[in-house]
């Protein structure tokens, strides 16, 4: 019975941590939006002129990258792999935290069921 209580408590802690990190990301995105809104129209026009010649693109999954910001998608990360002694960084879809939390919940439920037997 104590094991079941520990599993349930750890499950609640993991869900709380996952939700707080999502809230931090939302706050950061809102903060970024307000920064963009406060710029003057002239600055926007200058930025568009300067960056108009530059290519704005994101790297698709399983193509080489340098950091996470270059990869397309929220759950896509720039992960390093070693091939023939050389490090290669590729954009990979890791499924995000939601997938990991759901997998943890599934494992916890199966352990709780086995505790009841």
Curated annotation (Swiss-Prot):
Putative ion channel inhibitor. Expressed by the venom gland. This is Hainantoxin-XV. Belongs to the neurotoxin 03 (Tx2) family. 02 subfamily. HNTX-XV sub-subfamily. Residues 20-55 are annotated as: Disordered. Disulfide bonds join 58-72, 65-78, 69-115, 71-91. It is found in: Secreted. The keyword Secreted applies. Residues 23-55 have a biased composition (Basic and acidic residues). It comes from the Eukaryota. Coiled coil: none annotated. It comes from Cyriopagopus hainanus (Chinese bird spider).
